[in-house]
A protein has these predicted regions:
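PAPS-dependent sulfotransferase catalytic domain
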Residues: 61-73, 132-211, 227
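Canonical radical SAM enzyme core domain
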Residues: 113-116, 188-189
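Hydrophobic/aromatic beta-strand patches that form the interior of the parallel beta-sheet core
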Residues: 81, 107-109, 180-182
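Active-site rim elements
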Residues: 51-56, 84-85, 154-163, 183-185, ...
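Alpha-helical packing segments of well-folded alpha/beta enzyme cores
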Residues: 63, 67-70, 94, 165-169, ...
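The conserved 3'-phosphoadenosine-5'-phosphosulfate
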Residues: 43, 170-274, 292-300
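PAPS/PAP-binding and catalytic site of the sulfotransferase fold
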Residues: 19-30, 94-103, 122-125, 166-206, ...
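PAPS-dependent sulfotransferase catalytic core
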Residues: 1-87, 101-106, 116-142, 147-149
Length: 300
């Protein structure tokens, strides 16, 4: 395979820290991953599951020539990769196409989050985009038929099914010789070690993760995209504010703006949590045995 194509993939799971890991890895001098910068508009190419997501997702690469162009500046880098979370859920199509286009020696990285927490996080994410108008309880009760009957709805509404990791992970382990599993909680609480373990896995030098860099775990959502844009683009007017306002005032202003125009994410009801723990119980046990990791804390 060409050195200007990926030799590793982050395949999921959705809402499990993949974007943060992507951002940490791509800062390494010997890593290339497509991003929104440098005229590359696709952060998640999703090329290997294009048939599964057609009509459901707007932003994806649908042909190999365009896929190759994403990595045209990667030549000379030791680690070339991309992160597309739907590769885990639609594993059958993904694995078939990964082998077809990238070969069998590709390295696979999988982040896994407590499926109960992941389900609610996905719900909050979809709600943010205004693609969800049901309550969490309503959505998970009709999930299967909803996805089957609506060919335009995002795969992200598979709040429960996307957390049934066992068969997905098993398929990747059986299909590729180099598969690295990272638990979301390990990534959150020991980010530096988790990222450097990935560097070791990719056979490149370690790098210290700056303390101010944090994994984005969410928590609040913007009440309006206009306010989100203003907040995210604050660097453009921060220079002016530094000239007219002292630091303590700027800090309070920043906190006020964030708290005023964001909303708390939905929280899970006790009975809903109990239902989901029971739903995932057997799959978690099977997964625990498969990856040889204690996952009992996911059942509490």
């Amino acid at each position: 395979m060409s050195k200007c194509l990926p030799n590793f993939l982050i395949v999921g799971a959705a809402k499990s820290g993949t974007s943060s890991l992507h951002n940490f890895l791509r800062k390494h001098y010997d890593v290339f991953m497509p991003n929104y910068n440098y005229n590359i508009k696709v952060k998640e190419p999703r090329f290997f599951v294009k048939n599964s997501i057609a009509g459901r997702v707007n932003n994806y690469v649908d042909n190999f020539e365009d896929y190759k162009k994403l990595f045209s500046k990667s030549c000379g880098k030791s680690a070339v990769g991309e992160a597309s979370v739907f590769y885990l859920y639609f594993f059958k199509e993904a694995i078939r196409n990964i082998k077809k286009y990238l070969g069998n020696d590709i390295k696979i990285i999988i982040l896994l989050r407590n499926p109960v927490e992941r389900a609610l996080s996905a719900y909050n994410h979809v709600s943010r985009t205004k693609s969800e108008n049901l309550s969490f309880e309503e959505a998970i009760s009709i999930e299967d038929n909803r996805f089957k009957n609506n060919k335009n709805i995002t795969p992200m509404i598979n709040y429960k099914n996307m957390g049934l990791y066992y068969k997905m992970v098993k398929a990747y382990i059986e299909s590729f010789k180099d598969v690295k599993i990272i638990l979301f909680e390990d990534f959150i609480y020991n980010t530096n070690k988790s990222v450097n373990d990935c560097f070791d896995f990719l056979k490149i030098s370690n790098m210290k993760i700056l303390k101010e860099e944090k994994v984005n775990v969410g928590g609040r959502k913007w009440s309006n995209n206009f306010y989100k844009t203003i907040y995210n683009e604050k660097k453009h007017y921060l220079t002016f504010l530094k000239k007219v306002l002292p630091l303590n005032i700027r800090t309070k202003l920043n906190e006020w703006f964030y708290n005023e125009f964001t909303l708390e994410n939905k929280r899970m009801k006790k009975q809903t949590k109990e239902y989901l723990i029971n739903f995932f119980k057997e799959d978690i046990k099977s997964l625990s045995s498969l990856i040889n990791k204690d996952l009992n804390h996911w059942l509490k």
